UniProtKB/Swiss-Prot annotation:
GO terms for cellular component: cytosol. NADP(+) binds at R47. Its cofactor is FMNH2. It comes from Chlamydia abortus (strain DSM 27085 / S26/3). It holds the Pfam family Chorismate_synt. Reduced FMN (FMNH(2)). It comes from the Bacteria. Pathway: Metabolic intermediate biosynthesis; chorismate biosynthesis; chorismate from D-erythrose 4-phosphate and phosphoenolpyruvate: step 7/7. It catalyses: 5-O-(1-carboxyvinyl)-3-phosphoshikimate = chorismate + phosphate. FMN binds at R123, S124, S125, G283, K298, P299, T300, S301, S302, R326. This is Chorismate synthase. One of its GO terms (molecular function) is FMN binding. This reaction introduces a second double bond into the aromatic ring system. PROSITE patterns: CHORISMATE_SYNTHASE_1, CHORISMATE_SYNTHASE_2, CHORISMATE_SYNTHASE_3. The gene is aroC.
């Protein structure tokens, strides 16, 4: 089982949804970066349950620093972080442990390994992403030294969406962080969609977009470690992610070359582009433009409606998520912080690689 991501700036996550704790080890972070437990609070609180449309499971997600820090600064050694699980209820899972959960990784894990932890989804649960968000905090602090900033936000829920990529600014970022849905979309419309989901006991997918400040470093390694390839690998590893695009993405198929190509211009003394259909990457390398992309998330499979399945002995039956279970009617809202973290982790890794690319 591969639990490590990254090359020079890497993370290894461990732990299960209903285990005593989860954790992550970050390797490759340069020494001298200021870091304290308080630095993790804003990002962890954005991923935590408690917002409308999220799971009622109550987890503080306090990050405990176990190693790699001395006198408030990174030492260059591995940084170990630990997050305790404090609100676990495994009974609803044990009651239907004789059958497979449709739409979940349980069947695939058991088929591959011959054994699986079914409680709360075990290792395949979205709970694992708390570790990624914690690691992403460190990556973001490192990138800030190079004036590279990333922001993710909910850009589509149901029929409510924003198609364009806004320009990154600290003011826009703060407006997203202050939003109960981490979104520039109409809050009343989102709240109504979530209310309808709760009333019908159903779930819904969505889209998370990400934007960055202009990246003047040449990040990305031809030909197999292009920036968009690394982002795709990172973002598609998030639970429930089903699609990724950069820039104009799949809409590029409907454009003529004369419409799609981004004209090169001089702006403020720098080579720039009049548009950014490419999403900030040419030849798999960043070119001084913002990186823009989107990730599509499926509806969560944990709904309070029966679905056909079979028992572990092969007998037809049904599975219904028990009333005592705690799940998100729209997991996309809490995926916002995970997308932001994974983009930061990719960029931090590529930035370290770029430091080795030329004299």
């Amino acid at each position: 089982m591969r639990n490590r991501f990254g090359s020079l700036f890497s993370l290894t996550t461990w732990g299960e949804s209903h285990g005593p704790c989860l954790g992550v080890v970050i390797d490759g972070c340069p020494a001298g970066l200021q870091l304290s437990p308080e630095d993790f609070v804003p990002a962890m609180s954005r991923r935590c349950p408690g917002r409308p449309g999220t799971s009622p499971r109550k987890e503080a997600d306090t990050v405990h620093i176990l190693s790699g820090i001395y006198q408030g600064k990174t030492t260059g050694t591995p940084i170990a972080l630990q997050i305790f699980n404090t609100d676990v209820n495994s009974d609803p899972y044990r009651e239907q442990d004789d059958r497979y959960r449709p739409g979940h990784g349980q069947f695939a894990y058991e088929k591959k390994y011959g054994i699986v932890d079914p409680l709360g989804g075990g290792r395949s649960s979205g709970r694992e992403t708390a570790c990624r968000v914690a690691a992403g905090v460190i990556a973001a602090k490192f990138l800030a030294h190079y004036d590279i900033h990333c922001l993710a936000f909910l850009s589509k829920l149901g029929q409510v969406s924003i198609e364009e990529y806004p320009k990154y600014s600290k003011e826009f970022a703060q407006s997203i962080y202050n939003s109960p849905f981490l979104s520039p979309l109409n809050h009343d419309a989102i709240f109504q969609i979530i209310t309808d989901l709760q009333n019908t006991q159903d779930s819904l997918g969505g889209v998370v977009s990400f934007i960055t400040s202009p990246i003047h470093e040449s990040l990305g390694e031809p030909v197999f470690s292009k920036v968009q390839a690394m982002l795709a690998s990172a973002l598609m590893s998030i639970p429930a992610a089903k699609g990724f695009e950069i820039g104009l993405g799949f809409a590029s198929a409907d454009r003529y070359g004369s419409e799609y190509i981004d004209p090169i211009i001089i702006e403020d003394g720098r080579i720039s582009m009049r548009s950014n259909n490419c999403g900030g990457s040419l030849g798999g390398i960043t070119i001084g433009m913002p990186l823009n992309g989107r990730v599509v998330f499926k509806p969560t499979s944990s709904i309070h409606k029966p679905c056909g399945t079979v028992t572990k002995t092969g007998e037809p039956t049904s599975y219904v998520t028990q009333k005592g279970s705690r799940h998100d009617p729209c997991v996309t809202i809490r995926a916002v912080g995970v997308v932001e973290a994974m983009v930061n982790l990719v960029l931090a890794d590529l930035l370290l690689q770029q430091r080795c690319a030329r004299l």
